[in-house]
Amino acid sequence: LDLVLEQARLALRPGGVLFYDTVNRTLLARLVYLVVFQGLPLTRIMPPGRYAASRLRGPGELGEALARHGLRNEDVCDFKPRNPASLLKAVLARRRGAITDEQIPPIVDFVRVPDGSPLVTYLGYARKV
């Protein structure tokens, strides 16, 4: 993480913006990304190892890491499926080969929840100080 953030800092000019989309370190996030998306043969849609528990970060941890590299975290919002059952439906269809990755978002209908507490994934942006 530190190497990536340092490279982002070097690439940005003062006031430049870094947008991010990442996975939280909650129990639910681990279950979804490490078990459902990577571990269970029935629902595996990502190669094992794409996500590792050691690389998951909560919003507070990420904010601290951004600050260490001269990036001020400006906003974080929850990003989730409107209906979790639609995510399961899309994952199973993707696993069967019935749909492509590009067809997942309209099926799942992801929504941003600006004031929500991110349980699984979250979006945000930081600005170079």
Kindly give the residue locations of the regions a language model identified:
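Phosphate/oxyanion-binding loops and surfaces in catalytic or ligand/nucleic-acid-binding neighborhoods
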Residues: A11, R25, R68-R72
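Conserved class I S-adenosyl-L-methionine
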Residues: V17-L42
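Acceptor-substrate binding/catalytic loop of class I
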Residues: T22, L42-E61
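Residues in well-ordered alpha-helical elements
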Residues: D2, G60-G63
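A short glycine-rich, Lys/Arg-flanked "PGG" loop and its adjoining helix->strand segment in the class I
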Residues: D2-V17
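A C-terminal cap/extension of S-adenosyl-L-methionine-dependent methyltransferases
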Residues: E64, R68, N73-V129
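Short glycine/proline- and charge-enriched loop/turn segments
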Residues: F37-P47, A93-R94
